[in-house]
Design a protein with these regions (language model features):
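Short alpha-helical transmembrane segments in multi-pass integral membrane proteins
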Residues: 1-20, 78-145, 187-243, 299-364, ...
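N-terminal transmembrane alpha-helices
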Residues: 8-39, 43-44, 58-73, 77, ...
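Transmembrane helical elements of multi-pass membrane transporters/channels
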Residues: 18-37, 139, 150, 173, ...
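Helix-terminus/linker motif at the lipid-water interface of multi-pass membrane proteins
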Residues: 28, 32-50, 120-127, 183-190, ...
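Interfacial/gating helices of multi-pass transporter permease domains
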Residues: 41-61, 127-132, 192-193, 234-241, ...
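Small-residue-rich hydrophobic transmembrane alpha-helices
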Residues: 50-110, 147-166, 260, 273-331, ...
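Hydrophobic transmembrane alpha-helices of multi-pass small-molecule transporters
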Residues: 62-65, 177-182, 207-211, 283-286, ...
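Short runs within selected transmembrane alpha-helices of multi-pass transporters and secretion channels
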Residues: 71, 140-158, 166-174, 195-208, ...
Length: 448
């Protein structure tokens, strides 16, 4: 494992920034990656194609769910095992993660291609959107194995402490995507199919980059299949610990599909407006998530090493960081909402609606970090069941019923307001969990 001092003895704030900054850059790159498709498709001036990108969006959540379930679970276990001095277990985790990611990617790819028509109908396509959504999905499905591999391998590389190398892979993948997006979409006139092709190509390059690092420079990490055969039953532990991340991503996709099904009843412009508002605020939630996920190895290592004092300080500093960041970026997004929405939508009616909906989404920015942090803490200490329940709250148990209730009460505005109510409710419960752990760590530290 690289940089052991970073995990064990370094300044807490220095350790946080050393792990969080590369993770943030990776997430920003992913956001840029995600926004590039909608931005260049938006340049076509076709609201139906913009809406098609939004309708297929939940498929990205399905792929991300598989990747994060494997990658986050493996990352937490690898860091915790290293803290306890169990290096060989890390190799087993790495091997299991890589090969399971590959085979699941192939299965998901086949499933998406075979079931694309009923899937798109379920996701909320109407007659105007469907032809574009089908083209986008077909190309995306072919690249599913590379999407899953690139995302899970990025987490493995960070778990070894090589956050910079993980960042480089994401940068290269996004650079490829941003170069080929305008070429495929605008120059060659492939439209949404070109956006999907550029995304697949970018993920392929990122996968190759991570594979090269692991093969040539990995210490705990390996892609050799033999370690996986030594203890295949360990896959259950990895999946259990990574399940909260997977559930969160999957539920985000389900919530998005339910939202689109409700929005499409208000017209294609409503789907496009909510998609633009979501892209505008996605940067905030993704960066906060990156801070928490990037620092998860620090939490897991401190817990595995029995260092209660350091774990307590990590939690306090991360709470402060995520709340302050949420306040500042939420205010900035509110102030610049017209320019941000205008990046994705040119049609006047959809633009005006998008600027209204984004207000609801930014109001929850100060507290969303509490939910991410509490989930990552529970994963780091091996409390998988608690993390699963917490993941179910924000995107599932709270948001999905609220979408239908608020749509019935307030229409399109209510759909956006449902996200705010769910964010605040989940954050309140998460705050209670974090306070419980802080008190327990204070008592444990006092006993030492």
């Amino acid at each position: 494992m690289k940089n052991e001092a970073l995990f064990r003895t370094g300044s807490v704030w220095k350790s946080i920034f050393s792990m969080a900054v590369p993770s943030i850059i990776i997430i920003l790159v992913m956001v840029l990656y995600n926004m590039a498709d909608m931005f260049f498709v938006g340049c076509l001036g076709d609201t139906a194609q913009v809406a098609a990108v939004s309708v297929v969006g939940p498929v990205f959540s399905i792929l991300a769910a598989v990747a994060t379930m494997l990658g986050a679970g493996s990352s937490a276990v690898i860091a915790r095992c290293f803290g306890a001095g169990e290096i060989e277990q890390g190799k087993i985790c790495s091997s299991l993660c890589f090969w399971t990611s590959f085979f699941l990617g192939v299965l998901v790819s086949i499933g998406l291609l075979v079931g694309r028509v009923p899937l798109l109908e379920m996701l909320g396509s109407n007659a105007e959107i469907f032809p574009y959504a089908e083209r986008y999905l077909q190309v995306l499905a072919l690249g599913a194995p590379f999407f899953i591999l690139s995302n899970s391998m990025a987490m493995l590389v960070r778990a070894e402490g090589a956050a910079k190398e993980g960042m480089i892979g994401n940068l290269l993948g996004t650079l490829i995507n941003c170069i080929f997006d305008p070429l495929f979409i605008l120059v060659l006139n492939f439209g949404v199919s070109g956006a999907a092709a550029a995304s697949v190509l970018g993920n392929l390059v990122a996968t190759a980059c991570y594979l090269r690092y692991i093969v040539k420079h990995g210490t705990v990490l390996t892609v050799d299949f033999r370690p996986a055969l030594k203890k295949p039953q360990m896959l259950g532990e990895l999946l259990a610990i990574g399940l909260p991340n997977g559930i969160s991503s999957l539920l985000a996709g389900f919530a998005s599909s339910f939202s689109n099904r409700l929005l499409v009843t208000h017209g294609t412009a409503a789907v496009a407006a909510m998609a633009a508002a979501g892209k505008t605020t996605m940067v905030i939630s993704m960066i906060v998530m990156a801070i928490c996920m990037g620092c998860q190895p620090l939490l897991a290592y401190s817990y595995g090493a029995g260092d209660s004092k350091r774990l307590k300080q990590l939690l306090k500093d991360l709470i402060l960081l995520t709340v302050v960041f949420g306040v500042l970026t939420g205010a900035a997004s509110f102030a610049g909402r017209n320019a941000l929405i205008g990046m994705f939508i040119k049609e006047e009616g959809a633009f005006r609606l998008g600027t209204q909906l984004v207000v609801y989404l930014v109001l929850g920015s100060p507290v969303i970090g509490l939910t991410y942090l509490a989930t990552n803490l529970l994963q780091s200490v091996g409390k998988a069941s608690g993390a699963v329940v917490l993941s179910l709250l924000r995107q599932g148990l709270l948001l999905i019923p609220l979408l239908y209730l608020m749509n019935a009460l307030c229409g399109v505005q209510g759909i956006a307001a449902a996200h705010l109510i769910a964010d605040v409710g989940a954050a309140a419960i998460s705050a209670g969990i974090l306070l419980h752990w802080l008190r327990a760590l204070v008592e444990k530290t006092a006993e030492v």
